[in-house]
Amino acid sequence: NPQFPSLRKADYDTAQHHFHQPGTAGAECKNCHMIERVYMGIDARRDHSFRVPRPDLSVLLGTPNACNDCHKDKSAEWAAAEVSRRFPDSTHRQPTFATAFAAAWNDVDQKGTAEELLKIAFDHGNAGIVRATALAMLERFASPDLAERSSPVLRDADPLVRSAALPLQQTAPPLLRIERLLPLLQDPMRSVRIEAARSLLDVPTSYVSETDKSIVQSAMREYQESLLA
């Protein structure tokens, strides 16, 4: 398919690929690449990111993996060793955003973690939701310097990323914050406009120029209306 040049044509429904008997649950693509979890106690959903099983991350981070969903009598270490043995030349065991997210969650090595999260946020090879999550996790490391360094993503094409970048600006000086956030008060996406208004709540109106006050006031009204919706 010319739309997906990195995907090579191959027959994946073979024991050489999935290492299971054809026709069994282990041979089904969805059970290895679309693991299922129950949400809200009633709703079973499959992961549509279609990922390669990473039991090595289970060993490192305690995350779930497809292999042990079926092989419940085996350890993650066993699964990781099996995957490594069967796919020794795999390129899918490279570092992933999961390690940075786990470090941020556990407040490990704050400076190094913040740098990794910034890299993830600026990497357009990552999905928008991943980049936005990295920005959201950066809030615990918020500083004027981080506000400055993350400011370019305020102009990102993805509204999810723009919205997630806004809270980081709350540590920026008032005048700089207004300068950076004013365009987002008129963003085409309502969620971005509301988040921009919220991020300016503590800025005194005296910092806003007369020509811009109407823009700020309109955004604040929309923010207030969102609270009553």
What does each of the following model-derived ranges do?
Residues 1-126, 188:
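Primarily the internal scaffold of c-type cytochrome electron-transfer domains
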Residues 96-108, 129-142, 149-152, 160-174, ...:
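Structural detector for internal amphipathic alpha-helices that build alpha-solenoid repeat scaffolds
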Residues 122-126, 154-160, 185-191, 228:
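Short coil turns that connect the paired helices of HEAT/ARM alpha-solenoid repeats
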Residues 110-122, 143-155, 173-185, 206-224:
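Amphipathic alpha-helical scaffolding segments comprising HEAT/armadillo-like alpha-solenoid repeats
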Residues 127, 132, 159, 195, ...:
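C-terminal luminal/periplasmic domains and tails of membrane-associated envelope-modifying transferases
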Residues 9, 43-49, 79-88, 133-134, ...:
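Composition- and surface-driven signal marking solvent-exposed, interaction-prone regions
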Residues 64-67, 71-76, 182-205:
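Short, solvent-exposed linear motifs at loop/edge-of-secondary-structure regions
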Residues 41, 82, 146, 162, ...:
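Short linear functional motifs in flexible/disordered or boundary regions
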